[in-house]
Regions:
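Charged/polar, solvent-exposed surface patches and flexible loops
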Residues: 6-9, 34, 38, 68, ...
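Substrate-binding cleft of secreted/luminal carbohydrate-active enzymes
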Residues: 50-111
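Glycoside hydrolase catalytic-domain groove-lining segments
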Residues: 21-61, 71, 75
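Non-catalytic accessory regions flanking glycosidase/transglycosidase catalytic cores in CAZymes
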Residues: 13, 41-44, 110-111
Length: 111
């Protein structure tokens, strides 16, 4: 029995309003979409993507593909990109100087 089944069995009578998903992986937008779609179908509840991030690859292109898609899904109610601290790594929303948005920060801010 998986953890989801154990939780749902033990939570008899609980009111669950939404489920929370995290995603960290390479820049494969279709994999991200498939993961969240399967997650939603598994629980049949609205999804809050409270953490997601790109661990390798082109974060700019990834965000350009997934942000409009998430906005178009009525079952995705919230989302938050995880890597916000100042960094020279182009997978963070804040530039190294801490004074401006990185390229993906600008994409996220205008989505």
């Amino acid at each position: 029995m998986c953890i989801r089944d154990r939780f749902m069995s033990a939570c008899n009578g609980c009111q669950i309003d939404f489920v929370v998903a995290h995603y960290y992986a390479w820049d494969n937008a279709q994999d991200f979409k498939n993961y969240l779609t399967k997650f939603h179908k598994t629980f049949n509840k609205p999804v809050w993507v409270t953490e997601f991030g790109v661990t390798s690859g082109n974060a700019d292109e990834f965000l350009k593909q997934v942000l409009p898609w998430m906005d178009a899904q009525p079952w995705i109610e919230r989302y938050a990109y995880h890597m916000v601290a100042p960094s020279t790594d182009q997978k963070y929303l804040i530039s190294a100087d801490g004074q401006s948005l990185s390229s993906i920060g600008k994409i996220f801010a205008t989505a």
